Amino acid sequence: ILVVYVLVRLASNRAIRPFVENVERQRQFVSNASHEIKTPLAVLSANTDLLAMMGTDAKFVDSNKRQIKRLNSLVEQMLLLSRYDEGEATATKEEVDLVAVTKDIVEEILPVLNEKGLQVEFTGEAQTIITTNKSAMTELIRILLDNAMKYTVGKPVITVEAKRNQLAIGNATEPMTKEQVSQIFDRFYRVDSSRNRTTGGSGLGLSIAQKIAETNDVQLTAELTSETQIRFVIATK
C-alpha cells in the first residue's frame, strides 16, 4: 500500500508540475512586462507634454494624456497584483475600524462624488473592528468605492452597511446574473466590456481587492441583493 501511495504521489506531482510552472511563467511575464512598459509610457508622457507646449491641438493632447494615464494605472495594478501573487505584500496587523477608514476615504473623494452626483449613506453600527493591516484595508475599500462610483446606475447612492465584524459596500447596477457575480473577481473580467471602455475600468481592480483580502486573512464576497443591486462584503474569516 505504501509503495502504491508513493507512486501515486510521484505521478500526481509530475502531472501538476507543468501547470504550476506555466502559472509561474505567466506571473513572471506579467511582472517583467509591466516593468518594461513603464519606460516607454514615461517617454510618451514627456512627448505629449512637449506637443502641448508646441501648441498642438488640445483635443489630441488631452486624448493622449487620458490614454497614457489609463495605461499607467493598468501597469501599476498589474505590478501590485504581481507583488501579492509573490507574497510580498504581507504586513503587520492591528485593530482597524473599517467604518472610520471608509469615512476618511469618502472625505477624500467627495469632490468626485459631487461631480458624479453620488451620495454615500452609512447605516448600521458606528464601528466595524477587525484585526488586519490598515494600509491594505484602506486600499481594498478605496477599490470598492471606486468600483461603485464607476458602475452605479439608477439610484445615485452608494451604501455602506456596518456590522460588528463586517462592512458591506453596495450600489445599484445594470441587471446582473449570479453567474456574472461569481466571475466578478476574475482578472480582466468585465460584465459589460463596452461600458468599461467609457469608465476606464481595467478589469483588475476587484481582482486586486480579492488578493488583498486573501493576503490579510479577510473574506471578501460579492452578492446580489436584487437583480440590479450588488454589494461587496468585507468580513473576518
Question: Each predicted region: which residue ranges?
Answer:
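Glycine-rich ATP-binding loops of the HATPase_c
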Residues: 217-224
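Conserved catalytic submotifs in the C-terminal HATPase_c
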Residues: 94-95, 114, 119-129, 163
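Short conserved segment of the HATPase_c
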Residues: 176-190
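Short beta-strand/loop element within the Bergerat-fold HATPase_c
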Residues: 155-166
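Conserved micro-motifs of the catalytic ATP-binding
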Residues: 86-91, 129-133
